From Swiss-Prot:
Role this protein plays: Probable receptor, which may be involved in the internalization of lipophilic molecules and/or signal transduction. May act as a tumor suppressor.
GO molecular function annotations of the record: integrin binding
Organism: Mus musculus
Keywords: Coated pit, Disulfide bond, Endocytosis, Glycoprotein, Membrane, Receptor, Repeat, Signal, Transmembrane, Transmembrane helix
Name of this chain's protein: Low-density lipoprotein receptor-related protein 12
Cytoplasmic side: 514-858
Domain LDL-receptor class A: 165-201, 214-255, 374-411, 412-449, 450-486
Amino acid sequence: MARRWSTKESQRRGSAWLLLFLAGVYGNGALAELSENVHISGVSTACGESPEQIRAPSGIITSPGWPSDYPAQVNCSWLIRANPGEIITISFQDFDIQGSRRCTLDWLTIETYKNIESYRACGSTIPPPYISSQDHVWIRFHSDDSVSRKGFRLAYFSGKSEQPDCACDQFRCGNGKCIPEAWKCNSMDECGDSSDEEVCASDAHPPTTTAFQPCAYNQFQCLSRFTKVYTCLPESLKCDGNIDCLDLGDEIDCDMPTCGQWLKYFYGTFNSPNYPDFYPPGSNCTWLIDTGDHRKVILRFTDFKLDGTGYGDYVKIYDGLEENPRKLLRVLTAFDSHAPLTVVSSSGQIRVHFCADKVNAARGFNATYQVDGFCLPWEIPCGGNWGCYTEQQRCDGYWHCPNGRDEINCTMCQKEEFPCSRNGVCYPRSDRCNYQNHCPNGSDEKNCFFCQPGNFHCKNNRCVFESWVCDSQDDCGDGSDEENCPVIVPTRVITAAVIGSLICGLLLVIALGCTCKLYSLRMFERRSFETQLSRVEAELLRREAPPSYGQLIAQGLIPPVEDFPVCSPNQASVLENLRLAVRSQLGFTSIRLPMTGRSSNIWNRIFNFARSRHSGSLALVSGDGDEVVPSQSSSRETERSRPHRSLFSVESDDTDTENERRDTAGASGGVAAPLPQKVPPTTAVEATVGSGGNSSAQSTRGGHADGREVSSVEAPSVSPARHQLTSALSRMTQGLRWVRFTLGRSSSTTQNRSPLRQLDTAVSGREDDDDVEMLIPVSDGASDIDANDCSRPLLDLASDQVQGFRQPHSAGNPGVRTSNRDGPCERCGIVHTAQIPDTCLEATVKTETSDDEALLLC
């Protein structure tokens, strides 16, 4: 019996070592031989918060607990990464997941991109192979809290889509892709072009299932995982914790060994079944520790090694005797395979539960417990409540006592120095547990029950810098430095946000500036189009109509023709009609045409009006001599206060009807009557100017010779009237000189001006004045003027200052016509409107008068 046990133990140990280097791929009776870079799925972070990252070129992934039922409410994920430029091929070998419509209960997904599903499967049908388009693949498995099934088992292989040649254990597809030889003729298209299934019709045959002799009563039939053929194995290899059969038939449906006990002492020990040998698969043990003391219980695992294949084996430790999830202290798995492991309860009671799956096994664990402050019989107290240490732990280079008592005075180290190991290297206490290795083997940073100031103590008795706590990186190795961290935005994120905000603000300011600049340029262009024309452009664009034929004849520029209308006692001339129309529209007000847009300036208009009164400028339209003069002065003042009544064109007067002319009031409010004949008083002329009188007399006699009627009314011999006439003639002489000088200077710049334009010096000499005045020619109806003289326009007396001269003259001698502008020149007998001959100017009396008085024009 002892010999048999020895043989079984040796076989068990050999199988355990083989499991560390070999892995079988179970699928349709075929076995793929994988290299040392093969990944075998086990208990890992795949079913935790983060996915398990796999970088091996090939491997096997199984669901938790396969081939047993997977647990409920699990979420596992794997991330397979291949080399750049390679693709990943996944082939399912076993698949049994709870089925549902659209796979909403339990499901398996394969994704090329995270959170973007490209493949979802459930049920009992083996899915077809999956060939990725990228160098990475996400695999996710989910189960609900209802039905559980066997799960899945898949194999993956990564390589280039086209390769010139393949390895000896690989098959080259028709498209140049390489796959494992075991995938050939397995009724699945792993190549993508079905070339691995084309040559299977003739040579394909099922795995070796030839008949063999029945096994003995103490043997069982098994498909050997080593020879790939069915063989008979002794019953002793069944349920021994070692997998001998390819289908795991020797380790399935084994009876659970009884283990566990109730511990009621202040200290004690316990271990896994068969320790230090492998514990049986499917072990399920519970230890209840009740010291009967209120003090804490210290549980220490001196040796710990669990299996990690499948869902894995675990040890759960509870604070108390109840299996209460809220009082779970710690869960130990295959990833905690390091010693010592210490767990401290809050009371004198602890519950330890060990569970193993039915796949493979490991050495197990050995644990001790004791009440805080007590030591085991074979231990040495560290002093106070610092714990205990064994003789083997004395001077081994590792602190088993928090105060380092087990490492004091061990070697040739100085006082307050500790050895790194037995090689004689020492370090001071200040270098202990400061996250800086001073010993070659790092013993100064192991078993750190306390850390130096500025360091953080991890749950696995390691020390890290405090600045590394809650930095989103696992520096402790167990994630304890990232637990219970407040949600704080990293400084880098804040800096990036501030810089981004500044850049965005700067771009916004630049955009606003550009927008404002473009808007200003646009408005400037629009204003440039809307700007009023300058005075020069206005003069060039606003051409005046050429003078009429009658005006040219009246000015003496062309000789008269026979068929042109002439003045007669019974018919008014065309110019007289024009004069009457303008007078009816303006009410004896001077026509003032705006030169530029600045005519709206009231101050310039007031200034020009004052200048016209004091500088000798003449109004162009006046009332008749027979009309009441006092009302004319008040009417002129009233009309001057109307700035827009003068804005009428001369051409518009020709369209007035006869009724409008008849009904339009003149200066005195009546209808404008034909002008009376004018005979210059001979006595007054002779008294004033000799030569001028002779000329006037000759002109008068010439008129009588032609048969024209002349008024017989003579001028009164009253001395005041003669004095006023003399003063008026003197002022007329000065005005004629001024007009000659002005017209001579502006003749070169006003060639295109109409005779109806102004003769004001302010307008003809400068372009800055705003208003111009028109001289309206009139026609006299006297019969003593010949046809040529009647065709010429007559000047009207426009100065308000001569009213005193005209009123007494008319009042004293109603039969005699007062001296005004409506008449021929005393010198030549012609009515001058634009230019006055030099002979007429030389014949006038050179009498200087005040500028404040009105000037009479010939």
